[in-house]
């Protein structure tokens, strides 16, 4: 793959909770040999750090200061991306719906988003970047060479989240989980600052009736059309 003007190539993968964007982004980063940015994990880490430090979740200034002290990295170790915060591996579970809802609420604060916007853009380094989030293609990297928006029916997304949480021994009620996902969708899609919407030039992919491999193959085909041959 050849790129002009020394511009770092970026693939953005946006979508709601449970759409499969995290799995797809990690696989694309591995196949392409590029760096990974999972913006949702950064928000979740910020929420957990705020809880651990007894910081008021409604205190925007305190959250902004806390975020400025956090350094997150995604390291590919044996074909699996491991998350580090301030050079320490994140071992506690940050993928619960409780933490996810806190992260979604934190994302409403303009000052926090401003700090995160600048920080997320520091991940844009060669050989390339796969950025996973909700506003990667619209706000953070609007000039990305490839933009993908992944979605799925709420029931399917809720079941995926249920399966994911049960694997790490979390007991969750399906109806409650579905309700939480709908609530989060509403908050993410209707917020005034960086709402969850597909970029106008995004490849919109509905994964409701697709397997992980089918989603991956469709995404790779789209990337090939945009940037050239990929060996995988």
Curated annotation (Swiss-Prot):
Keywords: ATP-binding, Cytoplasm, Kinase, Nucleotide-binding, Transferase. The gene is cmk. Its main location: cytoplasm. One of its GO terms (biological process) is nucleobase-containing small molecule interconversion. Belongs to the cytidylate kinase family. Type 1 subfamily. Its EC number is 2.7.4.25. One of its GO terms (cellular component) is cytosol. It comes from Blochmanniella floridana. ATP binds at residues 15-23. The keyword Ribosomal protein does not apply. The keyword Transferase applies. It catalyses: CMP + ATP = CDP + ADP; dCMP + ATP = dCDP + ADP. GO terms for molecular function: ATP binding; CMP kinase activity; dCMP kinase activity. This is Cytidylate kinase. It is found in: Cytoplasm.
């Amino acid at each position: 793959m050849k790129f002009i003007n020394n511009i770092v190539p970026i693939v953005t993968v946006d979508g709601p909770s449970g759409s499969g964007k995290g799995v797809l982004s990690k696989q694309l980063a591995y196949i392409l040999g590029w760096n990974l940015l999972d913006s949702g994990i950064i928000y979740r880490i910020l929420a957990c750090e705020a809880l651990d430090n007894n910081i008021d979740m409604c205190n925007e200034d305190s959250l902004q200061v806390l975020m400025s002290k956090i350094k997150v990295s995604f390291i590919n170790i044996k074909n699996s991306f491991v998350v580090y915060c301030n050079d320490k591996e994140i071992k506690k579970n940050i993928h619960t719906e409780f933490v996810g809802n806190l992260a979604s609420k934190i994302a409403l604060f303009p000052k926090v988003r401003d700090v995160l916007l600048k920080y997320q853009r520091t991940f844009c380094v060669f050989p390339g970047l796969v950025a996973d989030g909700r506003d990667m293609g619209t706000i953070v990297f609007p000039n990305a060479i490839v933009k993908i928006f992944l979605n799925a029916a709420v029931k399917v997304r809720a079941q995926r989240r249920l399966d994911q949480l049960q694997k790490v021994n979390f007991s969750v009620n399906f109806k409650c989980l579905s309700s939480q996902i709908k609530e989060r969708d509403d908050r993410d899609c209707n917020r005034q600052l960086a709402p969850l919407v597909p970029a106008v030039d995004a490849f919109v992919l509905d994964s409701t009736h697709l397997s992980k491999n089918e989603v991956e193959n469709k995404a790779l085909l789209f990337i090939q059309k945009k940037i050239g041959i990929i060996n995988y």
